[in-house]
């Protein structure tokens, strides 16, 4: 019998005594409803039994299992079709072939054997040090599980390094401030004060030697000042205030003919698919009416008639289109008129008008579309709209989601489109003449699918909990029902929501095996969707590109949390495995970043969409810079990681930093800010063999705790104490103090007593770390910037001759007591604990420790 005849053979559905899930998994079933295995694995909704020969499952209906398909085609469905009844008579032959391919692919991918150890729940703690909450003058933030701050708070090595870094900066700022050298720029945030102060001190003391510095120094100063001025101008423009009476639309908008031929044409061809929230026919109509009544006749912009919302939409579209051309790196002769439009005040104008309406009480369609465009702009623009860690996006996103629900834009526009009964008043904008109920349903669907995906996307990027708490399982026709990429992705929403729930229901008890299965299912189903749309236009490829990077980013962040859990749990074998897996993932992602910058043609991403794809690449590359120091600080724990290997890791960090900051630091405000701390981290880690960075950090922080206890610390009553900021160091101090006046080397205590996983070595497991030198080579031979200005290596590398005066501090102990013999970590791991110096010899000059990390000639110059 051939394959085709086998497929057509009708199978008899026998009555099952076990549920269909257990039958497919080949696992034990207790035959209850739902069975214990499905309850344990979180598959309660799909736990069904076949009870008759027709194969109909016996199960109570639930939200996720309910088929929201109507038995008869209604007028609303004929106008704007949505969910389809799985009936052979209602489908065309093309649709049958399409979904036959879907079912075949799904069946092939789902009938795999699941090992028993993978279906058993395995829980890990992603918040071993609790949630990270920061309060400051302007904002309070609870950082998502996968943000930089949360990762640093979870990892004891990164937490200690970041704490040391902040104290070192504060001490140097106090020294420079006491000499009256503080430099402030009112247009920049307070966090820029250290950057400006160090730079001004550097320039002040070398100004007499400008001739000797030559052209390199002049170029350095010119670029440096221009960037500071540019980012200060960003903030000044966005903070500008307006009076509605003085705003004339014609002062900001190009002529209608240019808007239609250049701006709207570019928007519709290249950008609309990224943010498909409009009916373009309706949008063009509203823009034409606005120009006729406001721009050409000179009438004031009416808030009552929502002219101001149309005005804001035009401004945002122009600004987004200009960003598209700006970041495409194409010749300036493309779209020349668009590039000449001054968009610097556009964002301030939009913010002015948005709050002229009762945005926190009610919303209409134009206002919602304006809010979504603003959210999109915050994501793409070089200004700091979302914050350096996307921590400022949830309030605007929450406003958008609440407005959608208030307006009836929700799952009902897919599950019950025929149930919508409209009353469109005569003064509604857009008017009934141009926008009928069927058009509303169509736009509602586009908006909901877009907002829903962005809500899920932020969970994968930052680990924050989704704000939309409901999901449905969807199937659509191939052509008629998937006009946008976001609607097609609705078929993945159920999986993405399950991943969110598994991660955020209890971050202290996350089922890792379930999360891995869900991620694998998501990858597989996404691959199926991609394979079914190979004929898609090139303009859609950036969406698939972003989705792949989002999944990789989630996997990277989860791997780091997994490694930290095994380390705390002293699970030696799994710690070594996750250490290697995380490093391999870092290398893999770094290679992808390199190809994005230097081999972008192979990625088949339209250059006019790079203003959008740059954002996810920037977030992923930054995550690599955050995680790599964790490997370097832990390197001495592994016998197979020699000093030469650590130097390769440091070279790799330098290479990735150079690529990241040279490609993004000149344009993106948030990247420019991060260069300050990234340069310090590099200086901390780039030490000689006898000056182990981790030993110095521990020594410094223990000393700082002692100074706090003696009342000699720099911290005043308004600051949190070190034992509150980094409690693990306080616990370590208590362990050190148990040695009754004598102590072994502090690294020996850390590795063997306080953090006991360190007393095990890789000989016990046969683990051999794989450095992947071949894959790292592009970053080790960083010649891309040898013939031009390297912003990461060049900025702040001119020393102040007065640094010694700033860092000289009296000490109460002799130099001989300060010069503790430095024993390499490799030897410490193999030696028993032995008495050494008195505990009180931990009290050393804080600036001596700083100078032990930063060379005197470049401490002030670090960026």
Swiss-Prot record:
Extent of Polar residues compositional bias: 52-63
Keyword flag DNA damage: no
Region (Disordered): 52-99
The entry's keywords: Cytoplasm, DNA-binding, Metal-binding, Mitochondrion, Nucleus, Repressor, Transcription, Transcription regulation, Zinc
Pfam families: Zn_clus
SMART domains: GAL4 (SM00066)
SUPFAM superfamilies (UniProt xref): Zn2/Cys6 DNA-binding domain
InterPro entries named among the record's database cross-references: OAF3 (IPR050675), Zn2-C6_fun-type_DNA-bd_sf (IPR036864), Zn2Cys6_DnaBD (IPR001138)
Annotated Gene3D superfamilies: Zn(2)-C6 fungal-type DNA-binding domain
GO terms (BP aspect): cellular response to oleic acid; negative regulation of transcription by RNA polymerase II; positive regulation of transcription by RNA polymerase II
Subcellular location: Cytoplasm; Nucleus; Mitochondrion
Keyword Translocase on entry: no
Superkingdom assignment: Eukaryota
GO molecular function, one term: DNA binding
Listed GO CC annotations: cytoplasm; mitochondrion; nucleus
Known DNA-binding region: 18-47
Main location: cytoplasm
Family to which the UniProt record says this protein belongs: Belongs to the OAF3 family.
Main function: Transcriptional inhibitor with a significantly increased number of target genes in response to oleate.
Note from the entry: Present with 149 molecules/cell in log phase SD medium.
PANTHER family: OLEATE ACTIVATED TRANSCRIPTION FACTOR 3 (PTHR31069:SF33), OLEATE-ACTIVATED TRANSCRIPTION FACTOR 1-RELATED (PTHR31069)
Protein name, entry field: Oleate activated transcription factor 3
